[in-house]
Amino acid sequence: MGTLHGEKTMFASPNTFYIDESKLCFNKTHFNREDFNVERFMNLARQKSDLKTIQQDLRLYLKSVQNSMIELINDDYADFVHLSSNLVSLQDSLNKIEQDINRIWDEFKESTRESVGMAERIEQKCDELCSNREKQIEIRDRIYFLVAIEKLSEMLLHPPRKCSALWLQKAASFASELKGSTFPHSEEENAAEKIILSQLEAVLCAEGVRSAAGDCQNLPLIYSILSLTESTHSLTALLVSDLLYAEFVNEKHDESNQLKLLKQVFESVKKMRETWAEKMGTEHFRGNIRRFLDETLLTFILTFIDKCMGAVAVPSDTRLFHECFLLTQEFIDNWPSSHTCRAMLKSIRDKFNLLVYFKLETHRFGKQCDQLMSPEMFAEPETSENRENTPQLHCGVSRAIITAIEHVWSDDVYLPPIVDKLWDFTLKLLLKHFSWSQTMKNYFMEEKRDWTSMVTLRSDTGNLHQLVFDFALESIWGKFHDITVDTAPFGQCLTKHGRSIDSLCVQIDDSIIEMFSEVLHQEIAQVSDVPKQYRWTKKSPPTTHSKYVVTAIEMVENLKEKLCCEEHPHTDEIVRKVNLSAFNYFVGKGNEVLDSVEATGSSLSRFKRKTTTDSGSTVTDDDKIKQQIYHDAKYFLSYAENLVFSQADLTGLQEVVNRFDKDARSAIVQEKNQNEEAGNA
């Protein structure tokens, strides 16, 4: 049935093989799936048809696919043949175009051959013309050069005593022709130029000094000529040596008062500048001539400092150096044209060796602090030397550091250019003191075990930082504001250091509590000796507390007084911890004694009662021991109730007191029973 069905319906025409895909017994899209599986495909197909039908449909579908491939191949081949024929036609067209282009290019070259030759001849003539013109210019330049040398030599042969404006203008004209020559000259011409210019320079410099000392009218023209010949430095040197130095500096000046001499020079320089500006007028005293005269005056100051102020520039007397530098800085700040003479003004300031000055002012303090930092130098000086209304400093190194900081920032020492070095010096001293405090803390903990020295160390550690911080607010920040420096980063630096100081102070406080508690425990440990005082000693029963209790409380009060004297910020807390440690230690030791008495004293008590029946005594040695510890605990408890303690803190003491009351009641009952038994017997 499948074959008859295929023969009737599968072909649309004898030339075209066509099948109706909808009537196939399978779905051809299954072949396009990536997960195609033969077994699965056959299972699906057999649900619709038998194997024979499936085989026939597969053959028909295969034939259809083959026919489609043949048609595609035929179509591609036809396109290929058509494309090949078109390419052949295109190649013929390209060959024809190439032949036409070559023919046209040959005709163009032939037609322009004569024009090209003419252009080459014109270019050759132009090159010859340019060469001739260059030679003409060179010859003309050489003529002007030689004429200028000749004219200048004639003018300089008999130079005038005082140069007129006309003479200077002629000299300027000839000098410009000399310097304007751009072509190379012979050695003889160069030598002649050098000689003429040196003679002209000498005449102009001498005239420049006369003009500067007189009306200054020719000075701008003289400066222009010397600028052209690049000889202004010669005029500067002559003005400094022959005019300014000779007029402002007395060779017999008193070297003992260098500050006064420097002040006179600065005033004379300012006055000379004002005189030149007044004589030349605002029309001429500007631009290059003003810059030249300013640099000349500043050059004179540099020369003066080198010759007369060497002992000041390299400081031997720091106070004189400080005053001279401030005077110089004031002169620099008030110089009228500082924006154009910044380099010269900086050179004047650099004449003062600030690094040497800084080292001279700080070296002795650094050396002194290093000497005072050894443990052997730790001592408490006279408190009368401490200043009023300021935290007290005991140790020599602490006082030396605050003195050094106040000294270097004082108005007699401080200089704005070394503010960075002064701040570094301040920080180094603070860090050095911090390290010293750590070292001394460890020394007192591990070797000396001295709580009083530890209290002194704690006081100096906190007070020094507070002094420096207050000093920074009162003095250092003001100096930073004067030079427009933001103080916020520096304040943060001190705050960070303060946190380190606070942490160290907490450690020192803990060490104070630990060491003092050890000493206090040694005193309270005498509670263990109470049994020795009453066992077999026939002492009367105790009626008050022991002496060691009073001594221990006096020791705590001495600690409190010491801390209050040092204005310790946590005095009450430290005393509370020390007292609590003492109470707990007493409770532990007291209970040990009571436990020992109860464990070993019952048999002794019975024996002593038998041996002392005739005496009528009812108080045993154990009772005396318990009474003594009771009185001691009661005294501690009474003392503690006047302080700030919670009920939980005093539980141990209360238990010791209550323990005696309980034992006393038990003893009374027991004694009553024993007496009744004895009466019955």
Curated annotation (Swiss-Prot):
Subcellular location: Golgi apparatus membrane
Species this protein is from: Caenorhabditis elegans
Assigned keywords, A-Z: Golgi apparatus, Membrane, Protein transport, Transport
Keyword check for RNA-binding: no
Name of the protein described by the UniProt record: Conserved oligomeric Golgi complex subunit 2
Quaternary state and interactors: Component of the conserved oligomeric Golgi complex which is composed of eight different subunits and is required for normal Golgi morphology and localization.
Short name of any one Pfam family annotated for the protein: COG2_N
GO cellular component: Golgi membrane; Golgi transport complex
Family: Belongs to the COG2 family.
Membrane topology: Peripheral membrane protein
GO terms (BP aspect): Golgi organization; gonad morphogenesis; intra-Golgi vesicle-mediated transport; protein transport; regulation of cell migration
Free-text function comment from the UniProt entry: Required for normal Golgi morphology and function.
InterPro entries: COG2 (IPR009316), COG_complex_COG2_C (IPR024603), COG_su2_N (IPR024602)
